[in-house]
């Protein structure tokens, strides 16, 4: 007797699409079969011939919640957005209050997240100036990876590291057998350009974009790649916004370096042409780039040069964003993404023929799980894996309506954009957590996930 049968699936993996039924027992995929006519289960879900894919593993999430008085996110609310958006495992970034840069802070965050999240989760530790001895402790406590900032830091809370500090962190990550993710931009060049642009009266989104040009992003990427080559750790360069940066990482990868490229839906679905319409709600770092670069990014994604996609979900109160219409420097930096990442990729990627479903599963499910050592528990649907799955409706036709978001804040750079394709059912460990936009589980349903096998993730 099984707990659940999901029948009439067109099951998607990076290897292809097969017609099958999925049998679930004790939260795991117990069998995948072409014929379950004689099989009994407590519940049967008919996928009706729709595509069924693994739940998304979002490796880049900033809920920024460790205090109910904070203004940025809520574990329980933002994880509802994740559930509706098809994200079954979030990997939460260490930039919180307090930052996740010590063992004590890591354990407290694990406790609070476990009590309140509605989807499964893993945690980063932070690599900041002065906390090198804490990295091993957080690794041993279950951190799946670590983050350092080369720029765009939060001074006094999550400071950017010098090259020497970053190299020492890379060495420690290599010794632990973990993974380091970096925000790669050049802090001093950004500061110099901002000073010049502000002195000239620049206050709009074009001024912001000009203060963080492609060349400084790529200089930082090159620096990180050089340090990684010497230290030998696994490195993921986050939110790469431009195709030349992607090429730099791919070249290092082809030469045997354990380096990987993450981009995000914001860089694939928005360009500088949208600045006048979206304004400060598209203020992210690095900035979005030109339409020409956007075309090349899509080609690189389909051709395998981009390894993963992360939402970089991070909310600000609307009152932190609105001043940016008149003065971009007064706007908070970040955008919501949990509820929109998969639908936007289905809409502008899969349904426009720019991205196969198989490749989407690779970059949003399988590869993130592998890189962070949580595969095959997560990121795939095979016997023994957690029964985390999505039923997709590629014909659904609607628009992004940020006013209906489940997260703490109700805005989006994608607000009003058409959507064709979205998950209509989200399952985590055999339990339906969201269906047709309704969240069906309580706080604390989400479970903590940690690394399984580093070697298996290569």
UniProtKB/Swiss-Prot annotation:
It is an enzyme of class 3 (hydrolase). Binds 2 Zn(2+) ions per subunit. InterPro entries: Allantoinase, Amidohydro-rel, DHOase/Allantoinase_Hydrolase, Metal-dep_hydrolase_composite, Metal_Hydrolase. Pfam families: Amidohydro_1 (PF01979). Carboxylation allows a single lysine to coordinate two zinc ions. Its EC number is 3.5.2.-. Signal peptide: none annotated. Its cofactor is Zn(2+). GO terms for biological process: allantoin catabolic process; purine nucleobase catabolic process. Keywords: Hydrolase, Metal-binding, Zinc. The modification N6-carboxylysine is found at residue 147. Zn(2+) 1 binds at residues 60, 62, 147, 312. Belongs to the metallo-dependent hydrolases superfamily. Hydantoinase/dihydropyrimidinase family. Rather more predominant for the cleavage of aryl- than for alkyl-hydantoin derivatives. The stereoselectivity of this enzyme depends on the substrate used for bioconversion: strictly L-selective for the cleavage of D,L-5-indolylmethylhydantoin, but D-selective for the hydrolysis of D,L-methylthioethylhydantoin. This is L-hydantoinase. It comes from Paenarthrobacter aurescens (Arthrobacter aurescens). The gene is lhyD.
């Amino acid at each position: 007797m099984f707990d659940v049968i999901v029948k009439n699936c067109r099951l998607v993996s990076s290897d292809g699409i097969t017609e099958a039924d999925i049998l679930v027992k004790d939260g795991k995929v117990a069998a995948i079969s072409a014929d379950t006519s004689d099989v009994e289960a407590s519940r049967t879900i008919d996928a009706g011939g729709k595509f069924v894919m693994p739940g998304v593993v979002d490796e880049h999430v900033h809920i920024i919640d460790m205090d109910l008085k904070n203004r940025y996110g809520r574990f329980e609310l933002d994880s509802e957005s994740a559930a509706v958006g098809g994200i079954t495992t979030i990997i939460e970034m260490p930039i919180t209050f307090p930052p996740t840069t010590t063992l004590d802070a890591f354990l407290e965050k694990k406790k609070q997240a476990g009590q309140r999240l509605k989807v499964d989760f893993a945690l980063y530790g932070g690599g900041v100036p002065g906390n090198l001895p804490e990295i091993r402790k957080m690794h041993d406590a279950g951190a799946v990876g670590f983050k350092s900032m080369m720029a765009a830091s939060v001074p006094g809370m999550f400071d950017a590291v010098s090259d020497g500090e970053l190299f020492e962190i890379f060495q420690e990550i290599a010794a632990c057998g973990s993974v380091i993710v970096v925000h790669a931009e050049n802090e001093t060049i950004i500061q110099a350009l901002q000073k010049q642009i502000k002195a000239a009266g620049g206050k709009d989104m074009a001024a912001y974009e000009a203060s963080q040009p492609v060349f400084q992003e790529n200089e930082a990427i090159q620096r990180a790649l050089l340090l990684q080559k010497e230290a030998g750790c696994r490195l993921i360069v986050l939110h790469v916004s431009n195709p030349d940066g992607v090429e730099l990482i791919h070249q290092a990868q082809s030469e045997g370096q354990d380096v990987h490229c993450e981009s995000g839906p914001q860089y694939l679905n928005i360009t500088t042409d949208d600045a006048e319409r979206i304004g400060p709600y598209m203020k992210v770092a690095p900035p979005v780039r030109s339409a020409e670069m956007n075309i090349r990014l899509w080609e690189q994604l389909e051709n395998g040069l981009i390894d993963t996609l992360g939402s970089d979900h991070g909310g600000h109160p609307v009152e932190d964003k609105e001043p940016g219409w008149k003065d971009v420097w007064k706007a908070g930096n970040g955008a919501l993404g949990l509820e929109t990442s998969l639908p936007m990729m289905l809409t502008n990627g899969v349904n426009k023929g720019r991205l196969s479903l198989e490749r989407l599963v690779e970059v949003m499910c399988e590869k993130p799980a592998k890189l962070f050592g949580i595969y095959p528990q997560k990121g795939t649907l095979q016997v023994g894996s957690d029964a985390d799955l999505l039923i997709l409706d590629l014909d659904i036709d609607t628009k992004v309506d940020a006013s209906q978001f489940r997260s703490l804040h109700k805005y989006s750079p994608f607000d009003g954009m058409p959507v064709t394709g979205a998950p209509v059912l989200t399952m985590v460990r055999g339990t339906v957590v969201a269906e047709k936009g309704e969240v069906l589980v309580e706080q604390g349903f989400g479970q903590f996930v940690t690394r399984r096998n580093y070697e298996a993730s290569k």
